[in-house]
UniProtKB/Swiss-Prot annotation:
Catalytic activity from the UniProt record: (8S)-3',8-cyclo-7,8-dihydroguanosine 5'-triphosphate = cyclic pyranopterin phosphate + diphosphate
Binding site for substrate: 78-80, 116-117
Cross-referenced Pfam families: MoaC (PF01967)
Protein name: Cyclic pyranopterin monophosphate synthase
Length: 161
């Protein structure tokens, strides 16, 4: 038996609504989002120069990402406010592509998933890197922000590998 996909934030008449999760049971949930920031060689060199940018830029982006995950429900109108148990932000430097790859992981034990929190954290980390490097490269590209993994709840485990 297959079901027709629907937009859960629209009611039968097409009006927006916040999904009612009050009847759901709390379950362990995790989501991982990924994205990248690509820049020119000059900006990448400044970012990765010892004692220069890497520590400050990436630490600032990490803190911004954690704050963004915690405030997700304030930014996305129909997103539920939920208790985050964990937010982790990891960066991988890719010298060949002059890129910073971002991974945001969020966990909760709640009635709804943490996909939006992970996606928001990843997005804000990328925006923070952009902001702090834009003086050296006006053409920085934020790309491939996506949900990579989610687990928990009725829909179970999902991967985008």
């Amino acid at each position: 038996m297959s079901t027709t996909p629907t937009l859960s934030h629209l009611d039968e008449s097409g009006q927006i609504r916040m999904v009612d999760v009050g009847h759901k049971t709390d379950t362990d949930r995790v989501a991982i989002a990924r994205g990248s920031v690509r820049m020119n060689a000059t900006a990448y060199g400044l970012l990765t120069q010892p004692g220069q940018g890497k520590g400050e830029v990436l630490n600032t982006a990490r803190v911004a990402a954690v704050l963004a995950a915690k405030r997700c429900a304030e930014l996305i109108p129909l997103c539920h406010s939920l208790p985050l148990a964990f937010v982790g932000i990891d960066f991988e430097l890719d010298e060949a592509a002059y890129s910073v790859h971002i991974r945001a992981t969020c966990r909760t034990q709640y009635k709804t998933g943490v996909e939006m929190e992970a996606m928001t954290a990843c997005s804000v980390a990328a925006l923070t890197i952009y902001d702090m490097c834009k003086a050296a490269d006006k053409g920085i590209v934020i790309e491939q922000i996506r949900l990579q993994y989610k687990a928990g709840g009725k829909s179970g485990e999902w991967r985008n590998d």
